[in-house]
Swiss-Prot record:
The keyword Metal-binding does not apply. One of its GO terms (molecular function) is ubiquitin-protein transferase activity. This is U-box domain-containing protein 11. Signal peptide: none annotated. It is an enzyme of class 2 (transferase). Pathway: Protein modification; protein ubiquitination. It comes from Arabidopsis thaliana (Mouse-ear cress). Functions as an E3 ubiquitin ligase. It holds the Pfam family Arm.
């Protein structure tokens, strides 16, 4: 297997070693946890390859060897990085931070490259596992976008030397050093990394970064990024930035200054990470923070914007002319947010109703409402005993979650537990909006795990069975999204989702939900518990009946489910043959979509072998 390079079993052992590495408890906690979680997603892929036989053992093994080699390098690099990064203190030097930040980028890029070269045609990989691989790839790609791109052509030879403790100066020549420092600044402080900007890292490393790099990196994009960064760096080097404009944590010009409970001002991304790592004190004064509210410092932001304009320095996006969107709107919204904490039930009810209306109108309003600190207060109102307040609060959270950056703020506020409580015991309208909110939040891959473990799935299944038509739709979309993550499939089966879905296939009054039911079943069908439940519910005749309809998407999903159920099961293959599956499958193999044709052809081939 793997061209003699390595066996899947040995890589599974390597992943097990990675999982057992204690997580960093300092500034790298999230980076290490994210990388470990993404590596874990590869477990089922390697198990399936280990247990399967190559489709074409005579095929050339060059592509197979290449991807196995890339995967080995990436996983070994991940293990080394996680083993060393966990020892880093929060007060590590800025130079060390840039080096380890670059190493996280290299490991991320190498793993994504390996998965992009996976030779699907050489292995019998199920749709379920394929979806997990794509999930891991999408997470790695997003991480790469946050870190920035690599330029292996220009830096490969320079980076082949061990990295020195005091920075990059002993590694590359002056011109290359200038560019690499610019890259590191971009990797560390780019606009997209605000929520996950890389923290300080270890002081020394003998890891050769060229080990992670290859010649097909995004060179052109990097050049543009580096040149722009270098030009701006030259401008700022000639200026003395006012001390009050620098974040005390990063010592960088602040883009989004916020005030903490002690009155000190910090860059939002850095103080948020400081708090997320479990710190309870102000970094500068070491006083205990009475609360973790981050209040935007609009006066300082305006001064920074004006100073940037006067010195011809590019201003942070969104703050041009010293204003954030519309200052008048912001004043109104901040006043409404304050009223959310009023002692008067009626005042709270009216305020949340107005915020609901504003949050529905535009993206700008959703941004302003979040910046005004509304999200934690709205989350608290989800448990309000006043029905109208609770309904409006969950709808506000739903509307705010539409804006991508607000999703993380909602999760940070610990909203999931309260949303699930509304889903279980709220009014029908509140339950519907709670389900829709979980769907919106679950669009972020890492949230699927958190939501699945919160007890949301049984409540969603109950809404799927007993809700209004709209509630059923909201529950179905949320369940589909959550079940993409392998660990949630067993939870859904135990909650009785298969019974609910099968009823939708056979109940004529629910014909409008057939599409949703089939889509979810097609995702579940590769789970062993789900497979047993589907067969036990005598679903095969219903699936054959759907194959005979003219609904292309439904036929395609029915074929996918049948393929999962009947693979390696001669008895079931003979059964569906007797039920009349051959004729509609032949039609689908000729007239269906590409996916439908592929499923139909595979199923027909299995039927042919079963009848021999």
């Amino acid at each position: 297997m793997a061209g003699g390079i390595v066996s899947p079993a040995s890589l599974l052992d390597l992943i097990a070693d990675i999982v057992e590495i204690p997580l960093n408890t300092g500034m790298f906690k999230k980076d290490c946890a994210d990388l470990t979680r993404r590596v874990c997603l590869l477990t089922h892929l390697l198990e399936e390859i280990r247990d399967s036989t190559p489709i074409d053992s005579a095929a050339s093994s060059s592509s197979e060897n290449d991807w196995w080699s890339d995967l080995v390098v990436g996983l070994q690099a991940a293990k080394r990085l996680l083993s060393t990064a966990r020892f880093q203190a929060r007060d590590s030097s800025d130079g060390a931070a840039k080096r380890i930040s670059f190493q996280f980028q290299c490991v991320t890029w190498k793993l994504e490259k390996a998965l992009s070269n996976l030779p699907y045609d050489l292995y019998d990989i199920s749709d379920e596992v394929g979806e997990q691989v794509e999930l891991a790839r999408s997470q790695l790609r997003r991480a790469m976008q946050r870190y920035g791109s690599l330029n292996s052509n220009k830096f490969s030879s320079a980076l082949s030397e061990p990295m020195e403790r005091d920075g990059f100066s002993n590694v590359i020549k002056i011109k290359a050093e200038e560019k690499l420092e610019s890259v590191s600044e971009t990797l560390h402080f780019g606009e997209e990394e605000e929520k996950q900007s890389s923290p300080p890292l270890r002081r020394s490393s003998s890891i050769s970064l060229a080990y992670y790099l290859s010649k097909d990196a995004d060179t052109d994009r990097l050049d543009k990024m580096v040149n722009k960064n270098t030009d701006e760096s030259k401008k700022s080097d000639k200026l003395t930035i006012p001390v009050d404009f620098l974040c005390p944590v990063s010592l960088e010009l602040m883009k989004d200054p916020v005030i903490v409970a002690t009155g000190q001002t910090y860059e939002r991304a850095y103080i948020q990470r400081w708090i997320d790592c479990g710190n309870l004190t102000c970094p500068k004064t070491q006083q205990k923070l009475e609360n973790f509210t981050l209040t935007p410092n609009y006066v300082l932001r305006s001064l920074i914007s004006r100073w940037c304009a006067e010195h011809n320095i590019e201003q942070p996006a969104g703050y041009i002319n010293g204003r954030t969107k519309n200052s008048g709107d912001m004043s109104v919204i901040r006043a409404l947010v304050q009223r959310l904490s009023s002692r008067s039930t009626e005042d709270r009810r009216n305020a949340v109703s107005e915020i609901r209306s504003l949050s529905k109108r535009s993206t700008d309003n959703r941004i302003l409402i979040a910046e005004a600190g509304a999200i934690p207060v709205l989350v608290n109102l989800l448990t309000s005993e006043d029905v109208a307040t609770q309904e409006n609060a969950i709808t506000c959270v739903l509307n705010l979650s539409i804006y991508e950056n607000n999703k993380e703020l909602i999760m940070f506020a610990g909203a999931v537990t309260s949303i699930v409580q509304v889903l279980r015991a709220g009014t029908m309208e509140a339950r519907e909006n709670a389900a829709a909110t979980l769907f919106s939040l679950s669009l972020a891959d890492e949230n699927k795990i958190i939501i699945g473990g919160s007890g949301a799935i049984p409540a969603l299944v109950d809404l799927l069975e007993n809700g209004t038509p709209r509630g059923k739709k909201d529950a179905a979309t949320a369940l589909f999204n959550l079940c993409i993550y392998h660990g949630n499939k067993g939870r859904a089966v135990r909650a009785g989702i298969v019974t609910a879905l099968v009823k939708m296939l056979s109940d004529s009054t629910r014909h409008r939900m057939v599409d949703e039911a089939l889509t979810i079943l097609s995702v579940l069908a590769n789970n062993q518990d789900a497979k047993s439940a589907i067969v036990k519910a005598n679903t095969l005749p219903a699936l054959i009946g759907i194959l005979q309809t003219d609904q292309t998407r439904n036929r395609e999903n029915a074929a996918a489910i049948l393929l999962s159920l009947c693979k390696r099961d001669t008895e079931k293959l003979i059964t569906i043959g007797r039920l009349g599956a051959v004729v509609p499958l032949m039609d689908l193999s000729k007239n269906g979509t590409e996916r439908g044709k592929r499923k139909a052809i595979s199923l027909l081939e299995l039927l042919r072998k079963a009848c021999q």
